[in-house]
A protein has these predicted regions:
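Conserved class I S-adenosyl-L-methionine
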Residues: 55-64
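Glycine-rich SAM-binding Motif I of class I
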Residues: 66-70
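Gly/Ala-rich phosphate-binding loop of Rossmann-like dinucleotide-binding domains
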Residues: 73-77
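A short SAM/SAH-binding and catalytic strip from SAM-dependent methyltransferases
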Residues: 119-135
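C-terminal substrate-binding/active-site "lid" region of AdoMet-derived donor-dependent transferases
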Residues: 131-182
Length: 182
C-alpha cells in the first residue's frame, strides 16, 4: 500500500511538473522536483512532529510558496528560511510572508540546495523526491548539529530509518534526529 501511494505521489508530481512547465512565461529553471504545495493539515503535522519551538531555526528545502516557514513563524515564533531554485516561487513566498506580517522572522532565497549551507538550522523540512532526499542526506548529516530534526513529507531517506512515521490526510510524514558525530 505504501509503495502504491508513493507511486501515485510520483505520478502526480510528474504530471504537475509537465503542466507547470507549459504554464510559465519565465525562463526555464531546471527543477529536480516539481512544485506541489503541502496541504495545511500536513504542514501543521510536520511542525508538530518536529516539536518546533520559538528558539528553533527552520529551513524549508524546496519551499515553494513559503507556507511551512510562514506557518512556523506565525504559530510558533520560529525564525525561518525557505530555499527554492525557482525565482517565481521565491517571489510568491516573499509576497505571502508580507501578507502574513512575518517578514521580520523569515527570509526566502533562490539557491541550489546542493550548494547551500544548512548549518544554522535546527529543523529542516522537505517535500522532495526520494532521489533528491538521498543526495541531500550526507550533506544534512555533515552540516547539521546533533539533535537537529529533519521532517519529510511522503518520501524517506533510504536505509536511514526514521524515528517516527505518521499518516495525516493521506500523507506519510517522517522524522529523523541528527545523531552525534562520530
Amino acid at each position: 500500500m505504501k509503495t502504491l501511494k508513493n507511486l501515485i505521489s510520483l505520478i502526480i508530481l510528474t504530471v504537475c511538473a509537465g503542466s507547470s512547465a507549459f504554464a510559465q512565461n519565465t525562463p526555464e529553471v531546471k527543477l529536480d522536483v516539481p512544485y506541489v504545495p503541502t496541504r495545511p493539515a500536513v504542514v501543521e503535522a510536520m511542525l508538530k512532529l518536529a516539536k518546533v519551538k520559538s528558539t528553533d531555526i527552520l529551513y524549508d528545502l524546496g519551499c515553494g510558496d513559503g507556507r511551512i516557514v510562514i506557518t512556523a513563524a506565525k504559530k510558533y515564533g520560529v525564525t525561518g528560511k525557505g530555499i527554492d531554485i525557482n525565482p517565481e516561487r521565491i517571489k510568491e513566498a516573499n509576497q505571502n510572508a508580507k501578507e502574513a506580517n512575518v517578514t521580520g522572522k523569515v527570509n526566502f532565497e533562490t539557491a541550489n540546495l546542493f550548494e547551500t549551507d544548512f548549518s544554522q538550522a535546527t529543523v529542516v523540512t522537505l517535500y522532495l523526491l526520494p532521489s533528491v532526499n538521498l543526495r541531500l542526506r550526507p550533506i544534512l548529516l555533515k552540516q547539521l548539529q546533533p539533535g537537529s530534526r529533519i521532517v519529510s513529507h511522503d518520501f524517506d531517506m533510504g536505509d536511514w530509518k526514521p524515528e517516527q512515521t505518521i499518516e495525516v490526510d493521506g500523507a506519510t510524514i517522517y522524522l529523523w534526529t541528527v545523531p552525534a558525530k562520530k
